[in-house]
Amino acid sequence: MKRKDAIIREFSLKKKKILTSDDLRAVCDKYGFDFGRTKIGLMNKGYLLTIFRGIYYLRDFNEKKTGVIKYSTDELLSEGLRLKGVGNWYFGLNTALKRMNLTHEIFAVDYVLNERFNRVRPMEIFGSNFLFVKIKPSLFSFGIEKTTTANDIPINYSDAEKTLLDMAYLYRLSGKSGEAIISLIEEYAGDVDKKKLINYAKNYPKTIGKIIAEALG
């Protein structure tokens, strides 16, 4: 039996599509396959697709033929983060605004706020670009909408109030003026619960709370 056939059959029997290097290595050891050669061969033939380093999606024969896979890019991101041990994360900033239909702009990247890592440049996952922004753990305790897909995979995004506060907070960290933050808040003031916004602001530096209060009048 060819390597790819054995590998694909083995994971199909396990109903496992998303796997780690350790998962693949274990099956290679079972069949006596060289791990490195097997991995490279599967990649070169388009069966093994990288989500993150050491985390992959394994296409079956039908997916390879049709070009259609079981999961969406957001689902692959979610599962990849889970396997990397990133428990706290959500789609935020402009990405959250888009998901809530609060903007009609089209953005080149999706913003993923998380507890573990920053990336200066976007990371491409299956044709979509994601920019990872690290924030402090205390900012994961409120304002996050948690949904589950038809494939039972969690997808998180910030609500409108938290989204604006995150934007204001990151604006401030990047050196933007208070006037820029006020302009941002005023633009979306009609789309948020002002009491919730003020309450959430207690979790951010006091300067943010003062600017929010000024923007709301």
Task: Please give the residue ranges for each predicted region.
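Hydrophobic alpha-helical interaction segments
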Residues: 141-217
